[in-house]
Structure formats: structure tokens, C-alpha cells
Amino acid sequence: MAAVSLRLGDLVWGKLGRYPPWPGKIVNPPKDLKKPRGKKCFFVKFFGTEDHAWIKVEQLKPYHAHKEEMIKINKGKRFQQAVDAVEEFLRRAKGKDQTSSHSSADDKNRRNSSEERSRPISGDEKRKLSLSEGKVKKNMGEGKKRVPSGSSERGSKSPLKRAQEQSPRKRGRPPKDEKDLSIPESSTVKGMMAGPMATFKWQPNVSEPVKDADPHFHHFLLSQTEKPAVCYQAITKKLKICEEETGSTSIQAADSTAVNGSVTPTDKKIGFLGLGLMGSGIVSNLLKMGHTVTVWNRTAEKCDLFIQEGARLGRTPAEVVSTCDITFACVSDPKAAKDLVLGPSGVLQGIRPGKCYVDMSTVDADTVTELAQVIVSRGGRFLEAPVSGNQQLSNDGMLVILAAGDRGLYEDCSSCFQAMGKTSFFLGEVGNAAKMMLIVNMVQGSFMATIAEGLTLAQVTGQSQQTLLDILNQGQLASIFLDQKCQNILQGNFKPDFYLKYIQKDLRLAIALGDAVNHPTPMAAAANEVYKRAKALDQSDNDMSAVYRAYIH
């Protein structure tokens, strides 16, 4: 591949890892962000996603030269929105250039005039100038009366413009904050960098740490610069992260990837077991993105809708696994997860060398480790991938996926994770994702109980619950979760988006996780008791927000 000449401000197509090429712009990195060692790379901000990353030069292509090619390959909605953002950026930049063309012409005229004044004047010209001198002085006097002070040529320029003219940059020398890039700024891009879309340019506040600029951006950068070296060996060794060169086995930063752009479906056959609240949305998105999917559910009627959408029907879990390359499973609890694998006509009976199994259930680390061992012992490959989200996020394909286990299988699931989620995290050895998922749900469940407690306390003290919600929505606690759950309570709508019985199960497992390492979890324990009371009030199959009823009965 021929070398491509790129400069700061150039529009490019950037290829990041396993994701499709995405439109972006080469920008200056934050001053305290070190450039990765090794091959030459540029810092790129992607349109439509707010993601940033160092991209190797061989993974970059000029935007205009490859535009038609990329548009033919990718057809997704988010990809098209990103392309539209680029075109809007170009339109506004062009309009800015046209607006400034007149001032550029004036500058040129002034330079020409200056050159005329600086050349030697002949005798004839001196006589002509002396004859017209009186008229010139008169006109200048009239001009002073008409033109307000401050509108002179010097006064019409901004302080920044004057500073730039007084301190011109030496040719070929990049500004101080561009030294890491070692590239000159393209003259054709200067207008774009100052145009109406200036918000697209990376502009860190020097008085604030970079991580405050974009929470996801900070984690994304960590994932690009601090990835631990990982490898896998057979059976149990295959499921462990190898020690880094320093000898430390701790994971400094999870390997995460922002899922964006259109999805190019894998040619592998996909199986899916379990069509509950979460599984149904996941399968629907897999089918929409063009995957070949075989489904199974304990109650076969739930499969009918997906058969109409193009899915195939599997009669047993073993049949699905044996006929598919990668099989996902999403069931309710540890017992259901074990029964699915170890029971009659279960997953284990269909496992052969090379078959892949991905468990998306929220279970404890011991359960998922046991499942991994039996799958790998049959020559299969295993990945745990519980998801953070609810029914609506599942339907929208906006789940957060926490994966651990076989790194190669994680890569093979790329298009599937793109279809079902907005972000995926790789957390290392089997059991890490289960632990992280329980901690996430422990925080969520405890917060939900606190919300319910606050609303009931407001009610019994004569305060408006709606006003409390309005105040919370204007403060630091404001979130979609807070607003939706409070609205559910105020409207008395407890249609399940996340079953109360499942959040209580996760709290119980999180408390057990704390007990196993002798770590106190008093807040989770208190919340768990409230959920147990709500279950006793027959709220198990309602949404988790129904914990509110435990406080009013």
C-alpha cells in the first residue's frame, strides 16, 4: 500500500480494530496524552460518535478519495449520520471560506499597495504626487469626520489576528502543541478549524483535567494505551490472563470498544437460547443486522415471532449448539444456566471441538467458572458476556456488554456485539465479568431502593413527590434511570423493564461475593431486605421500581 500524506485537520477514514472504517478528522491530542510508541499514528476524532483514538497511518485513508467506496460498503443508520455530519461540516467550512474571500482580497490589495509605496519613486511621479497632495489631505480630513474612531484598519482586527500578524510562524516549524504529530498544518484546513463547526475540534480546557471532557473518552483512551498482554492456554490455563512483563496479574484497564457504525454480519451461524425480556431484543437486533440465527426457548411459542422474521427453530439446546458456530444463551439465574448446559439434551451434548458458547446470563463467578470448565473440557470455546441494561435498551441495541474468557471468541463475536450493544468491555479471565456485573447491579438496586425511600419520605412529610423529582433532575443525580423509575412510581406503572425478582437475586449474589472476600456490604444488605419485603407483597414479576410498595404497606 502506497504511503499516504496526511496533515493536521485532514478528513480521513479511520479503521479502529475490528470495526468498519469511520469518518473522522485529524486533530491535536490533549497536551498530557502521550503518543504511542512504534509506528507513526495520528490522533483522530470520529464524526457522530465523540470517540477519539490514536490510529496508525496505515489504517487511515483520505476522506474524499475513498468516500464512494466506503458508502457502498456501509449502509447503517449511524454510519450515514456520521457521513451527513462530515458533509455538513464541509458545507459550513466552505461558506466560511466564501465569507472570508472578500477580506482576503482586501489584504492582497493592501499588500500590493504597500509594495507600490516601497519601490523608488521617479521624478515625474514625485511631481504628480505633490499636485494631488492637497486633495488627498482634504479627503482624509473628511474621512475623519465620517469614520468613527476604532474602525481604522488596525482597530478592525481582533487582538488574536493582530498577534498572529505580529508573530508570524516560521515556515516548516510546527507550533509547540503539534510537535508530537511532527506534521505541518494544512493551509486548506485553517478555515475549517475556525469555522462554525469549531466544536468538533479538540479543545481541552487547560485548567481542567482531560478526563472531565468526556467520561467515555477517558476510558476509551486507557483501553488504547494500557492494554495488558493476554494469551490463553488449554483448559484452565486457557481461561487465565498471562502475567504482564512486570509480573503483575492485575488488570490496569479493561479493554473496551465503543460500538458504532454499520454492522457487517459474520458469516458464522449464530444460535440463541432464551427469549426473555433481554433475549428477545437481542435476537431481534441480530436478525435486523443480517445474521443467520437459530433460536430455542423453553416455551416454544416465544419463537414464533422470530421465525416469521427469518430465524430458524432449534428443537433442543444440543441441536442448536451442534448446528451453529457460536451459540449465545441468556437465562434468568444460576440454576437455569446450569440446567441449560448440563441438563437433558443440553448444551454440553452438542459441544464438539471448535464449537463456541457465550453465556450472557447474570450469575455468580463460581457458576460461570464451572460452565467454562465443562465446555472447554469437550474442546469447546467459552466466553461469558452478561449485559448491563433493560428491556428498552435491549430493544434499541444499546446494551453494555461485559465479556471475559476466550479473547479470540470475543473478537469473533464482533458483529453480534455491534448489533446488540453500544459498548463492549473485555475484562480478562472467566469470572471477572460475572463479578463486575453483580457489582453494577448491586449499585443499581441499592440506588433504586434509595429513590423509593426518598419519594415515600417526601409523601409522609407533606412534600410534593413531583417537586422532589424536578429538583433531582436539575442536580448532579439527574439521569435517565432516575427519571424513568420515578415516573413509573408517580404513575403507578410497574410494567417490568427489569424484574424485581432478578435485581433482588443480583443483590443476594453481590452480598455473597462480598462475604467470600470478607468485604462489608451493609448498604446492599439493607436494600436486599426491602426487596425481599416487596417480593412478599407479590411484586416479584413487576419492575424493580415496585420496591416502592414495600415502603407504603
Swiss-Prot record:
Region described as Dehydrogenase domain: spans on this chain: 261-553
Protein's name in the database: Cytokine-like nuclear factor N-PAC
Entry keyword Ubl conjugation: yes
Region (Interaction with histone H3): 214-217
This protein's domain notes: The A.T hook DNA-binding domain is required for the interaction with MAPK14.
Residues bearing the modification Phosphoserine: 130, 167, 540
Basic and acidic residues biased stretches: 92-145, 162-182
Domain of life: Eukaryota
Species: Bos taurus
